[in-house]
Regions:
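General small-molecule cofactor/ligand-binding pocket signal
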Residues: 47-49, 95-99, 148
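Short glycine/serine/threonine/alanine-rich loop segments
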Residues: 42-45, 92, 116, 145
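Short, hinge-like loop/turn segments at secondary-structure boundaries
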Residues: 63-67, 113-115, 137-138
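Glycine-rich, Arg-bearing micro-motifs that act as flexible, cationic patches
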Residues: 118-142
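Short, acidic/small-residue loops that bind anionic groups at enzyme active sites
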Residues: 142-151
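A short acidic, glycine-rich active-site loop
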Residues: 65-78
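Structural beta-alpha unit
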Residues: 1-14, 85-119, 126
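Small/aliphatic-rich secondary-structure junction motif
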Residues: 7-63, 88, 142
Length: 151
């Protein structure tokens, strides 16, 4: 039941798009596997978003920005190929996006733009995130879609 004037329900009957954030970490690969299974069972599209973080040291020395950009492009290419191979094996409608920026901002932007029905991310492996707040916590607080955090 939807309360009058509520705009919470965004989608259609059944999901049409599952978004997974992937950065190459162990937990992000587990999140990708979970999201792929979910997309297969729900017969919907899977969008994987790789976000290369911008470093505060990007302008510290000549060539640093180019080297970082090249490394991010190489990592994104390897992740995309592995994801495409897995999606093809599962018969999934799959899309991949690689962007540079803040992971929360970029995942939030992609989810809004494409009207994702759910967002799946891996649990943070960084101890400092327990104090500052993890990407998953920030996505949950955005409150726009269901967020699944895979350990």
């Amino acid at each position: 039941v939807t309360p009058p004037g509520s705009d919470f329900e965004l989608g259609t009957d059944g999901p049409t798009l599952i978004l997974v954030g992937i950065d190459g970490s162990r937990t992000s690969w587990r999140a990708a596997a979970y999201a792929a299974g979910l997309a297969r069972r729900q017969h919907c599209r899977l969008l994987a978003v790789y976000v290369a973080r911008l470093s505060a040291n990007i302008g510290a020395a000549p060539g640093v920005a180019a080297a970082m950009s090249e490394a991010a492009a190489q990592a994104a290419g390897e992740i995309e190929q592995r994801m495409r191979d897995g999606a093809a094996e599962m018969g999934l409608d799959f899309e991949f996006r690689a962007v540079m920026g803040d992971p929360w901002t970029e995942l939030n932007r992609a989810a809004k733009e494409l009207k994702a029905d759910a967002v799946v991310v891996g649990a943070s492996e960084h101890a400092g995130h327990r104090i500052v707040g993890s990407l998953a916590t920030r996505l949950v607080r955005a409150g726009k879609w269901p967020v699944t955090v895979v350990p």
